[in-house]
Amino acid sequence: MQPIQIAIVALVVAIIIAIVVWSIVIIEYRKILRQRKIDRLIDRLIERAEDSGNESEGEISALVEMGVEMGHHAPWDVDDL
């Protein structure tokens, strides 16, 4: 192979690696943003429960829509056996 062909192949490989790495970064960033949104909703829910004595149905339904279940956060810490 001539040097120009080696350079072109190296450039293509570098571009493919960059695309894969940035795809992984974007996926992880979206996960972090989703987790922050869930954490904010849970914090608001806890704050409202402390203030009013009951939980807000709107925020619980928003968490359920996102796939977050409320309940025991640590399944190994259950005292109702």
Swiss-Prot record:
Per UniProt, subcellular location reads as: Host membrane
Give a Gene Ontology cellular component term annotated to this protein.
membrane
* Coiled-coil blocks: none
Note, other: HIV-1 lineages are divided in three main groups, M (for Major), O (for Outlier), and N (for New, or Non-M, Non-O). The vast majority of strains found worldwide belong to the group M. Group O seems to be endemic to and largely confined to Cameroon and neighboring countries in West Central Africa, where these viruses represent a small minority of HIV-1 strains. The group N is represented by a limited number of isolates from Cameroonian persons. The group M is further subdivided in 9 clades or subtypes (A to D, F to H, J and K).
Cystine residue pairs: none
Q: Name one GO biological process term.
A: symbiont-mediated suppression of host innate immune response
In the record, the note on similarity to other proteins reads:
Belongs to the HIV-1 VPU protein family.
The principal location of this protein is host cell
The record lists the membrane-crossing segments as 7-27
Q: Which SUPFAM superfamilies match?
A: HIV-1 VPU cytoplasmic domain (SSF57647)
Give the record's free-text account of how this protein's activity is regulated: Ion channel activity is inhibited by hexamethylene amiloride in vitro.
Task: State a single Gene Ontology molecular function.
Answer: monoatomic cation channel activity
Organism of provenance: Human immunodeficiency virus type 1 group M subtype B (isolate BH10) (HIV-1)
Topological domain spans for side Extracellular = 1-6
- InterPro entries referenced in this protein's UniProt entry, alphabetically: Vpu, Vpu_cyt_dom_sf
Membrane topology per the record?
Single-pass type I membrane protein
Q: How is it modified after translation?
A: Phosphorylated by host CK2. This phosphorylation is necessary for interaction with human BTRC and degradation of CD4.
- What interactions and quaternary structure are annotated? Homopentamer. Interacts with host CD4 and BRTC; these interactions induce proteasomal degradation of CD4. Interacts with host BST2; this interaction leads to the degradation of host BST2. Interacts with host FBXW11. Interacts with host AP1M1; this interaction plays a role in the mistrafficking and subsequent degradation of host BST2. Interacts with host RANBP2; this interaction allows Vpu to down-regulate host BLM sumoylation.
Gene3D superfamilies, sorted: HIV-1 VPU cytoplasmic domain
Q: Which residues carry this modification: Phosphoserine?
A: S52, S56
User: Which keywords label this protein?
Assistant: AIDS, Apoptosis, Host membrane, Host-virus interaction, Inhibition of host innate immune response by virus, Inhibition of host tetherin by virus, Ion channel, Ion transport, Membrane, Phosphoprotein, Transmembrane, Transmembrane helix, Transport, Viral immunoevasion
Return the protein name: Protein Vpu
Topological domain (Cytoplasmic) residues are 28-81
Q: What is known of its domains?
A: The N-terminus and transmembrane domains are required for self-oligomerization and proper virion budding, whereas the cytoplasmic domain is required for CD4 degradation. The cytoplasmic domain is composed of 2 amphipathic alpha helix that form a U-shape.
Described by its record, this protein's role is as follows: Enhances virion budding by targeting host CD4 and Tetherin/BST2 to proteasome degradation. Degradation of CD4 prevents any unwanted premature interactions between viral Env and its host receptor CD4 in the endoplasmic reticulum. Degradation of antiretroviral protein Tetherin/BST2 is important for virion budding, as BST2 tethers new viral particles to the host cell membrane. Mechanistically, Vpu bridges either CD4 or BST2 to BTRC, a substrate recognition subunit of the Skp1/Cullin/F-box protein E3 ubiquitin ligase, induces their ubiquitination and subsequent proteasomal degradation.
